[in-house]
Amino acid sequence: MGSVLQENGQLDGDKWTPFLDPQTWTTYLLPGLWGTLKAAVASILLALIMGTLLGLGRISEIRLLRWFCGIIIETFRAIPVLILMIFAYQLFARYQLVPSRQLAFAAVVFGLTMYNGSVIAEILRSGIASLPKGQREAAIALGMSTRQTTWSILLPQAVAAMLPALIAQMVIALKDSALGYQIGYIEVVRSGIQSASVNRNYLAALAVVAVIMILINFALTALAERIQRQLRAGRARRNIVAKVPEEPDQGLDTKDNVNVDWHDPDYKEVKHPGPSF
């Protein structure tokens, strides 16, 4: 393969020099990178909100709400992201639901939000279901309502337990933003190909785009790992504080008013005489 690339001139130095020109970055790569980050951040935030609401609705005590959320989750998890983007693009364009300049962006965010939100909902539902049932029962026994139990007891633990899966889903959302290329959205892959069509360096352009995506994924993973460490440290501090008694132990309270020096091996019991009548 290397010899074939060498024969086609794809490994020549002049194929890589355009990336040393600031104009290549300001014209193609940086606008595409901004488009990728903008779509990914918007869709991840909306997917987290949607996934939380659907996940809680999936475990609701209201049967109709459980069925409704379950239908939404299973439907949008089964549809490919690209089909969701194309459907949203045609829907928004036909009924003029969004401005024409934001049409591709809205379609990309819609597709990523609906798919990843459904997956996140199932992740949260599984995380809550994996917690011991005794925690819910204890909270209810203490007088907490179902909503208080879910938001204050179950949901924080489920998020902490399922954080690696949530991080993986965020990375998937970031990479799937490249599918917006099919509906004309300007993101980093499309910008890289546009740059390659001008400079005739497709291999170099795709390699640079791949490095950019890898760096973004590493940064997202590092941020999530830092958040996870802070969550674990916070739980550890709370456990330590919970185990420290509020008052020091004062020893045994004897009923017969016996003072005992437990430090002296030859201690003697000294009894205080009771009140004389």
Curated annotation (Swiss-Prot):
Segments crossing the lipid bilayer: 37-57, 67-87, 103-123, 153-173, 203-223
Coiled coil: none
UniProt keyword terms in alphabetical order: Amino-acid transport, Cell membrane, Membrane, Transmembrane, Transmembrane helix, Transport
Main location as per UniProt: membrane
Example of a GO biological process term: amino acid transport
Gene Ontology cellular-component annotations: ATP-binding cassette (ABC) transporter complex
Matches recorded under CDD domains: TM_PBP2
Domain ABC transmembrane type-1 residue range list: 33-224
Pfam families in alphabetical order: BPD_transp_1 (PF00528)
Protein name: Glutamate transport system permease protein GluD
Organism, scientific name: Corynebacterium efficiens (strain DSM 44549 / YS-314 / AJ 12310 / JCM 11189 / NBRC 100395)
